[in-house]
Structures are given as C-alpha cells and as structure tokens.
Amino acid sequence: MFKSTLNIAVAIVCSSLVTLTGCEPKVAQSQVIQPLETPIVIEHNLGQTVISNRPQRVAALDMNEVDFLDQLNVPIAGMVKDFVPHFLEKYKNTPDISDLGAIVQPNMEKIYALKPDLVLMTPLHANQYEELSKLAPTVHFDIDFRNSHGHHVDIIKQHVIDLGEIFNKQTLAQKKVAEIDAKVDEVQALTAERSEKALVVMHNNGSFSSFGIESRYGFVFDVLGVKPASTEIAASLHGQPISSEFINQANPDILYIIDRTAVMEGKPVIDAEHLANPLLRQTKAWKNGKVIFVDADAWYITSASITSLKIVIDDIIKGYQS
C-alpha cells in the first residue's frame, strides 16, 4: 500500500514538473497498440504508405521532421543527431531519444534496434525507402532540396496536415498551417512593393556558391517574392560556385549569406566586419548595410519545416528594413 501511494506521489510531482517546463522534449513511451478504425493512406513521391495503428515509436531521419513533430507535440523515439539546429537543441542530449546517426546516412542497425512503428524520411534517404518500408510504415516528405521553385510552402503545409491526421492532431496542424500562411502573407506584402534585387549565397571555407530561382532556395524568389539580382544560376543542391567578381557584377541591393562553415564547425566563421573583400564592398548591398548573415541552422540544416520557414522569412524581412 505504501509503495503504491509513493508511486502516485512521484507521478504527481513529475507531472507538475512537466507542466512547469513545457519546453521539455517529447519522449516516446511504450503504450498499448491503438488500431485505427479506418487505416490512413498517405500518397507520396515514392509510393503509398498505409498506417493501420496510431504510431507511438517514431523515427525521424531529418531535422525538418523533428521540428514537425516538436510543433505538433508528438513524442520521438529516435532521431539523427549529427547536426541539430539551435531551436531543437533540447532533443540532442536527451538519452531516452535514440541517436540514429547522421542525416545524410542514418544508421540502419540502430533504426532496426529501435523497432519504430513509423519512419519519417526525406529525399536524402530515398535509396533506403524500400528497406525501411519493410521495417515499419515509412512516409516520404516530398520536399525538393535541389529545386524548391514551385510548391515548397504548399508541400510543407500538406505534410503538416498529413502528420496531423496520422497523430490525431488535426486542430493543432490547422493552427500551424494558419501560422505559416500569416508569415508568408507578411513577407509577400513587403516584397511586392519593393524594387530591391537580392542574391542568396552560401559561404563554405572561403568560397561562395549562389542560389537562383530554380535552386534549393528558389522558394525565396517565386513564393516569398524576393526579386533576383541574377537569373543565370542553375538548379543545384549546394549552389553554383561563383566568384567575388560575379557578386560584384550582379551588384545586389541585398545580399543574404548562409555560412555553411559555421554549421559544420559549430560556430560563426565570418561576419561583415571580417569579410575583407574589396569587390564585395563595392556592391550596393555592402554600401547600404544590406549584407544579411542569415540563421544558418534554419537555412542549411532545415528550411522546410514550420520553425525554420518562419526564421527564413524573418531573415528576408531584415534585408528590407532600414
């Protein structure tokens, strides 16, 4: 009797702590299988996924997926942990969430050991789709990391809706979609009235790559309304290598810089003060104080989730502020 009373008391205390620390990561717990009255069918680019039970042990193989689950308050059983953005840092060192390896190459042995009942993956893991599907229902996030021109934001919103249905979080999912719409409307209203042209470039160990309309960051131009300073850049995951002369000739009004090296090394590497390049300093962007060092975690590690999209939009807005 004493032991039972003690357990109840401990449970009440733990419950209170969780309430007070609402930012704690959601960790999957072993629960009774919950069959669905009607199976959920998710159509995606790699096929069709049928979900017959409410998932309770979810494996997330990408930081975008971790953010979706976090925003929908869905517990996570396992995730890749090699590059965790600052806004998901609470998950990195949580021992009850299994480390499934690297984003680019998850550890299949650890995924098997986890025994997930749902796997969330992206095009980076397309080659593992068949194998993963034999282990558990596997949903492919149809985002295009090479060319986001077209339906980037719509794909994000649809994925939120799909996950809301899978986890019985439909109302919260609709709320998150409304938040995305409001943020997109905010930046579109701003860019529609402005004539400034911008370049999006990535810094990597002293070199630069540029991203155009049909690139990884194409949605910045075709959805969010930023006017490109150059249309000569082809579709690419890592951008087209460019020189300082290219940036100088494009002469953007706004220059957005993604510091990939900062992500890889875990600390900022460059800033405007230390970017001692005379050609860059001749651009309108430099002269007018419109060189924006964006949130590299949001732009490079993610950029296709709820939180990261909001951060990307906030970074874009900075380029139009006085």
UniProtKB/Swiss-Prot annotation:
It is found in: Cell inner membrane. Disruption phenotype: Mutants are unable to grow under iron-limiting conditions. Residues 1-22 form the signal peptide. GO terms for biological process: iron coordination entity transport. Keywords: Cell inner membrane, Cell membrane, Ion transport, Iron, Iron transport, Lipoprotein, Membrane, Palmitate, Plasmid, Signal, Transport. A lipid is attached at residue 23 (N-palmitoyl cysteine). The keyword Transmembrane helix does not apply. One of its GO terms (cellular component) is outer membrane-bounded periplasmic space. Residues 57-322 form the Fe/B12 periplasmic-binding domain. A lipid is attached at residue 23 (S-diacylglycerol cysteine). It is a lipid-anchor. It comes from the Bacteria. PROSITE patterns: FE_B12_PBP, PROKAR_LIPOPROTEIN. Belongs to the bacterial solute-binding protein 8 family. Involved in the uptake of iron in complex with the siderophore anguibactin. Binds ferric-anguibactin in the periplasm and mediates its transport into the cytoplasm. Part of an iron transport system composed of the outer membrane receptor FatA, the periplasmic binding protein FatB and the inner membrane proteins FatC and FatD. This is Ferric-anguibactin-binding protein FatB. The gene is fatB.
